């Protein structure tokens, strides 16, 4: 059972203050906080603990939620620090010589035990809520409506490497080959018996990953690309 629940503090989303920018999900190294756009039918089937923003996703009728997996979160606080609503609240309070009221934050850290009910909402959204192609694009906001194909890795809390790797899988993951160089990425990316790379739940496609020895990943990657091109050429000739 790999949902370790190791974080002392995990994020709590405040739908009343959220501006739906998705910056929190964009910086999350472990894909444990994710935006979802739900149809009325999907929203009706969601667990009672699911929180929704008052306003729908812009220019749609979709219900917006930011789902958090407290049992997968590492407690790095990057989501809290990246939130522009939080930054604005802190700036306003600093100008007044006070501290910001937590009620003015769109996301804040809370003890993990107080957030366990949100696991059901996260699990439901991951399993049952479909992607909405019209919302997906190569922006901070739009990219986060795409399912990440790297999730819940064993990288350290706040790891920038898995943040970038997760984002790349959202942009290109269904047609992505990874020739991994030995290092941190071979530990969080391929430790037996599990892998954090996954497949898109609707297409069944995901990254193809392999790890060569230390400095040989460039040659290994070249071989992978060369054979892929050769196989494609042979397939065309066979038609």
Question: Could you tell me what each predicted segment is?
Answer:
Residues 1-20, 37-75, 107, 113-115, ...:
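Ferredoxin-like iron-sulfur electron-transfer modules
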Residues 23, 38-40, 44-49, 78-79, ...:
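Short acidic, glycine/serine/threonine-rich loops at helix termini
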Residues 23-42, 69, 78-114, 135, ...:
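Iron-sulfur cluster-binding cysteine motifs and their immediate structural context
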Residues 110-112, 181-189:
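A glycine-rich phosphate-binding loop feature that marks nucleotide/adenosyl-phosphate handling sites
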Residues 124-134, 197-208:
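Acidic, Ser/Thr-rich peripheral helices and adjacent loops at domain boundaries
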Residues 154-182:
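N-terminal amphipathic, basic-rich helices that act as targeting or association modules
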Residues 158-159, 187, 193, 202-203, ...:
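Metallocofactor- and cofactor-centric catalytic cores in central/energy metabolism, strongly enriched
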Residues 229, 236-239:
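Single conserved hydrophobic/aromatic residue that forms the stacking wall/gate
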């Amino acid at each position: 059972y790999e949902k370790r629940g190791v974080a002392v503090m995990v994020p709590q989303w405040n739908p009343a203050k959220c501006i739906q920018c998705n910056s929190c999900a964009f910086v999350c190294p472990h894909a444990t906080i994710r935006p979802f756009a739900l149809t009325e039918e999907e929203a009706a089937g969601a667990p009672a603990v699911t929180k929704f923003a008052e306003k729908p996703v812009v220019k749609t009728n979709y219900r917006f939620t930011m789902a958090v997996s407290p049992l997968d979160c590492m407690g790095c606080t990057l989501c809290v620090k990246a939130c522009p609503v939080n930054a604005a609240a802190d700036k306003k309070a600093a100008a007044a010589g006070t501290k910001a009221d937590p009620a003015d934050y769109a996301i804040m850290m809370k003890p993990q035990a107080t957030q366990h009910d949100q696991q059901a909402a996260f699990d439901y959204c991951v399993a049952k809520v479909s992607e909405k192609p019209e919302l997906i694009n190569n922006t901070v906001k739009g990219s986060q409506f795409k399912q990440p194909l790297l999730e819940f890795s064993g990288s350290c809390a706040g790891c920038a490497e898995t943040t970038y790797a997760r984002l790349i899988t959202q942009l290109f993951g269904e047609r992505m080959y990874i020739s991994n160089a030995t290092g941190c990425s071979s530990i969080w990316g391929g430790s037996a018996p599990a892998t954090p790379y996954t497949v898109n739940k609707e297409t069944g496609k995901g990254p193809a990953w392999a790890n060569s020895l230390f400095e040989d990943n460039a040659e290994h990657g070249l071989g992978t690309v060369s054979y892929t091109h050769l196989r494609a050429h042979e397939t065309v000739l066979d038609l």
